[in-house]
Amino acid sequence: MKITAAVARSAQSDFTIEDLELEEPRDNEVLVKIVGVGICHSDISARDGQIPTELPVVLGHEGAGIVERVGAAVTTVKPGDHVVISFATCGDCAPCHNDQKNYCEAFPALNMLGIRLDGSKALNKGDEIISSHFFGQSSFANYALTYESNVVKVRSDAPLEILGPLGCGIQTGAGTFMRAFKCEAGSAVAVAGGGAVGLSGVLGAVVQGCHPIIVLEPHSE
């Protein structure tokens, strides 16, 4: 199908808006019409060669939208469902089975290389192959092809245009205090940096009952 996407073609350069061809969903894949997407520093790092993603590539990994079509083996979502897209995991390794999917043994291959596990890519522009499946989604586009394993269904009245960062930045910050540190109520915490990830960490600390919560920000003077 024809889509419009922001393509990263070289390091330190602007993204270009281009018309591309996107494959139909495979058995375990979900086609999502993107409503909103965040931009993360990891997208810039991939464009600039700090993450080993082959250029040209469609980046974007904080997508949210509406399911358009699903592959034959998909059972957890259906067309019309509202979803947030997070990182991809294999579901078969020990960390995945132990509810530690962020430590998935296939994480680099599934998320950072711009390919499926079989080495294929889902995007092209004529004879030119474009890297896809960045963090299992490549959501800097009006449509993204993702995996069933990394879409999370949300309420139909949830504001999709602002939910995308739940897939990366917000869970990174909040998860630090709620899952990694498992802070107990009354714990004193300090957060260095009051950006999106830092403030999400503050919210996670509030949920855990931490006190005091201190945010450190550089001062221009």
PLM segments and residue spans:
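Extreme N-terminal starter segment of soluble prokaryotic enzymes
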Residues: 2-4
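Extracellular beta-rich ligand/substrate-recognition surface
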Residues: 7-14
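Short Gly/Pro-enriched turn/cap motifs at secondary-structure boundaries
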Residues: 21-22, 54-60, 132-136, 142-143
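Glycine-rich beta-strand-centered segment in the early N-terminal region that forms part
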Residues: 23-37, 47-97, 110, 153-157
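Cysteine-cluster motifs in flexible loop/terminal segments that predominantly coordinate metals
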Residues: 87-149
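Mid-domain Rossmann-like dinucleotide-binding core that forms the NAD(H)/NADP(H) cofactor-binding site
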Residues: 142-143, 149-151, 155-221
